[in-house]
A protein has these predicted regions:
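Active-site beta->alpha loop and helix N-cap motifs at the rims of alpha/beta catalytic domains
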Residues: 2-11, 15-145
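Catalytic alpha/beta core domains of metabolic enzymes, predominantly
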Residues: 127-128, 139-229
Length: 229
């Protein structure tokens, strides 16, 4: 079984703004609040951080300041996803030296490509980037589902380390777990499905609600791991 990058609750950070600009002081306070409450990792400029509405310069600033504030205490994961393959590659090249442990890559949105197109998209990213890749499946937002057979084809490249799964179709999640066969770490991508996915073998959650309830989400995961949930 693959060694997880983190175990427990990670927070997909919001991006604090004031007067139309990134509020760096508020971001630093948010990071410190998260760490004081036991989160296991942070995601900077994932989709919760609204990167599609930020400039590249703003995204780089947010990621850099997050890494700086964390100062090595937990892994930081940067969001590089886009609906353009080359844009993802360019984003990773821009962010790769900022100190992140991995990149989170959401499936392309709006384009509604085929599974073959999805495979080609992710394999191009795998070939032309350096940071380890966490796949992000969120069909309610993107209309695309990474199917089990596509996972089977992607995994042998060795570039993919985890799947953030935000599908409510638990039967399909079970099929994906069979396809993964311990070669990727599974994380819940839906707060309300954290407990069911932990019971199915997930190693934690990449959470939105932990922006305001970090201690509670960290405690939920730890209680499950300790057999107290």
């Amino acid at each position: 079984m693959t060694q997880p990058l983190f175990r427990g609750a990670a927070t997909a950070l919001v991006t604090p703004l004031r007067d139309g600009k990134v509020d760096v002081d508020a971001l630093r306070r948010l990071v410190e609040q998260q760490l004081e409450n036991g989160v296991a990792a942070l995601v900077s400029c994932g989709t919760t951080g609204e990167p599609s509405t930020l400039s590249l310069e703003e995204r780089e600033l947010v990621i850099r300041e997050t890494v700086k504030a964390v100062n090595g205490r937990v892994p930081v994961i940067c969001g590089t996803g886009a609906n353009c393959t080359q844009a993802v590659i360019d984003n990773e090249r821009r962010f790769r030296d900022l100190g992140c442990a991995a990149q989170l890559v959401v499936t392309p949105y709006y384009n509604k490509t085929s599974q073959e197109g999805l495979y080609a998209h992710f394999m191009a990213i795998a070939e032309h980037t350096e940071l380890p890749i966490i796949l992000y499946n969120v069909p309610s937002r993107t209309t695309l589902e990474i199917l089990p057979d596509t996972l089977r084809r992607l995994i042998p490249s060795g570039r993919f380390i985890a799947l953030k799964e935000a599908s409510a179709n638990l039967s399909l999640v079970l099929e994906k777990l069979d396809a993964i066969d311990g070669r990727l770490t599974l994380y819940s991508g839906n707060d309300d499905l954290t407990y069911p996915l932990l019971a199915m073998g997930a190693q934690g959650v990449i959470s939105v609600v932990s922006n305001v309830l970090p201690g509670e989400m960290a405690a939920l995961c730890q209680a499950y791991f300790d057999g107290d949930a």
